[in-house]
From Swiss-Prot:
Protein known as: Large ribosomal subunit protein uL6
Family, as annotated: Belongs to the universal ribosomal protein uL6 family.
PANTHER family: 60S/50S RIBOSOMAL PROTEIN L6/L9, LARGE RIBOSOMAL SUBUNIT PROTEIN UL6M
Molecular function via GO: rRNA binding; structural constituent of ribosome
Length: 175
């Protein structure tokens, strides 16, 4: 069996997990997340411990995937997720206008990004953007979408980058 699927998940206080025949629902302080349940994976709730098992050996990897998703759902509704982006470059600025994010990235026009439902955007400074939410996948998707407006270039490192991202720098051509 998958080593990931063998490990039980502990459910913290304030988080409620319900298992139906076709849906897994996780309710917590920050919100509610649902995930479609596969018939090939058994989910057993025993007090504050969740255990998963596969119906047959060919679905062991699926059980590991479902376990990882469930673990992220539990963490999301209790703590939440965030990704930080940094703007590097002269004149590159970020600001909030209501719920929308305004980005000045050296184009002839400012970019306006409308966040999807369930995602919160913050700008602690003009060169930082913080993406927050309860769904890890959506937080990552939104952060990647914002980064795609001006990815960092390898010569000067200008652009939008993740806070912990190391940019591989290239040396300029010597004449």
């Amino acid at each position: 069996m998958s080593r990931v699927a063998k490990k039980p998940i502990s459910v913290p206080k304030g988080v409620e997990v319900s298992v139906r025949s076709d849906m897994l629902t996780v309710k917590g302080v920050k919100g509610v997340l649902t995930f479609p349940k596969s018939d090939n994976v058994n989910v057993v709730v025993d007090g504050d411990i969740l255990t998963l098992s596969a119906n047959d050996p060919s679905h062991v990897s699926l059980a590991g995937t479902v376990r990882a998703i469930l673990s992220n759902m539990i963490k999301g509704v209790s703590i939440g997720f965030e990704r930080k982006l940094e703007l590097v470059g002269v004149g590159y600025r970020a600001s909030m206008q209501g719920e929308n994010l305004n980005l000045s990235l050296g184009f002839s026009h400012p970019l306006v990004f409308v966040p999807p439902e369930g995602i919160t955007l913050l700008t602690p400074s003009q060169t930082e953007v913080v993406v927050q939410g309860i769904d890890k996948q959506r937080v990552g998707e939104v952060a990647a979408k914002i980064r795609s407006f001006r990815p960092p270039e390898p010569y000067k490192g200008k652009g939008l980058k993740y806070a912990a991202e190391a940019i591989m720098r290239k040396e300029a051509k010597k004449a």
